[in-house]
Amino acid sequence: MKFFPTRTLLCLCIAAPCLPAIAQNDPIELPDIGTVAGSTLTIDQELIYGDAYMRMLRNNQPVINDPVLNEYIDNLGHRLVASANDVKTPFTFFMIRDRNINAFAFFGGYVALHSGLFLHAQSESELASVMAHEIAHVTQRHLARSMEEQARRSPATIAALAGSLLLAIAAPEAGIAAINATMAGSIQGQINYTRSNEKEADRFGIATLAKAGFDANAMPQFFTRLADEYRYASKPPPMLLTHPLPEDRITDSRERARQYPPLKLAPHLDYHLARARIIARYAGIDADAALDWFARSEKKIDATLQPSIQYGKALVYLDLKQFDKAEPLLTQLVKEQPDNHFYLDAISDLYIELKQADKAQSLLEKALKQTPNNSVLTINYANVLLKQDKFTDAIRILQRYTHDNPNDINGWQLLSEANSRLGNSAEDLAARGEIMALQANWNKAIQFYTQASQLVELGSLAQARYDARIDQLMVQRERFLSLQ
């Protein structure tokens, strides 16, 4: 299924720790961060700030809401987390549409990857090395420790810094000014602390990488290539601004990687499928440029990875509505790997365009028997039902899906559309309210739920449910505003 990000990108690149997202219906405890005496951040406080940051990011940055890519980076990220030490909280991995090379982590369990990383990482191990580095920032609580270090210099720093980061997401000029003002007078200490954090994240990241079965040398290899490529650049990529690569850091990472046995890993097809999907849809290049890239790569890529080239070309043809070119490519790919979620997602879109949604439904039902409740398959299945005007069935599936995945905007968008087309105006408004809440647009969320409440029978269970949600949203709004 095809989804496109919206909004412009504010590049807030903070290499730091992360913790788990708060479920949207859970009560939020207001942290005691604003006091002058506060000099430490608890895990609970980090969770609250992280949830707030993520809601603002969804509103102000082009977060990629692509089910297939989300599944890929989530699986890869959690494979690494399973091998990391000192993991005390869940992780959430997401992507931002930006050709710049960067990744960052922040409060709340969130690790962000720029889509540009896939254009520069030459293997899954190299991508995993960046993710392992960010995971280490999380497990070692570098952002919290950095703020605590500042608090020892100025007692008000934690409250000011945490609030200014939220402002930076909402209004970059105000936030950056607030950060600069807060940290004035202690810059050199912060620089030294940041360098120490980077080396520590490298050390823990390489250990995680090796333990998870990836090539530990991928990290120094990626570092070396970046340093060589941008050594004399007047405008280096954001990653080199937030993650400086002095020679001693590269040398240190190389020496640490040598402590692990060298690995010769076969290229991983799913990584190259994800890369092809990004080039076709999220690289900011036109169709001709994408097809040219695939044509050049086809001549030099390993035979086992040729399916990624065919897949990438099929996506371009699909987006160009050249279905006669896309169909034979996707049909062959599905024949070779009938359970591959990249292929099933694309061929479902193709069958919808060809007015053959029943074929997509049959394929997805078969796949769901193998992996029930899978996010990629469920979202595509609901969409296929929707395109066949099977609104009641789609709503039933999406209600369960949004209950289990309350932070997935894709589910709420489809649920809103299904209810709208069925004429369930109140439920349509409620789903739209959840989308607004996920984007920190509290006033709009409350407005939609208020309208929903006014549409249903006075005193009904539906009205009670809507009114209870309004109360929750009002509390969340006030607590969110108090963090700024």
Curated annotation (Swiss-Prot):
This is Putative beta-barrel assembly-enhancing protease. Keywords: Hydrolase, Metal-binding, Metalloprotease, Periplasm, Protease, Repeat, Signal, TPR repeat, Zinc. It comes from Vibrio cholerae serotype O1 (strain ATCC 39315 / El Tor Inaba N16961). The keyword Transmembrane does not apply. Its cofactor is Zn(2+). Coiled coil: none annotated. It is found in: Periplasm. It comes from the Bacteria.
